[in-house]
């Protein structure tokens, strides 16, 4: 009857809209329901293309290699390089182009997982938009910088890691989450600095090396050279250690106006060292280390670790040397 007639223009229009939305969502999520051994992973981090290979062994490339060895497809998205290359008068910071390029990349690649590493240029709002467009995608972030209150750039690093914490499904830190009272414990996990057999190839334990102890620092991997007037507590520590241990032969860089070393020069230098000092900026905190730990262990240098890092939970006394203080370290170097 006319009274019970329901096939109005509005009803049919809503029906078409719902059908269209259902089909579009299926198209968007197509290719995201896969077996775990064949995933598409979009890895957003700084691959340092503009540095001409100086950081060819950086953590982002190590993680890429690990995913590929596990049988996954990996697409690298170098956010800082893209932002730098696409700056213009119309897009002064390059942010608009970066976000547009990310959306187009996701549309074409249809990732199962999006991984962000120090991707500060990607906003939480952009991540939320991608999650809305691709509801089946899982998103995680990794973070390598120190997060202890007495360490360098604490407030800045804290803000960086918390910036997207509510937009990602998981966060991976090189500091134990149990040592950080500001991090939600339910979706934060410890990740060690990765070593890679294609980068760490030296096997120094099989060689007769001329240098006893190697140590290198820098004033920032992107800067490359020492910054005038910058102070670093590790300089005082290492200089004191050298004075306390006159019978050991040290090879140090980034200290006393000796410039940092990079790329192939770095590996050629540590190839001649028996032992390596794993010394990170700031006070020791549970499990934290800079990525030098992977380079020292991975290349077969006997590595010294501050026992206040609690890394003896992960390494035995047969795998590393743990020291209590600088005097203890000096004595153990000479043993």
Q: PLM features: what roles do these ranges have?
A:
Residues 118, 131-139:
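Short, conserved structural micro-motifs that define repeat-unit consensus positions
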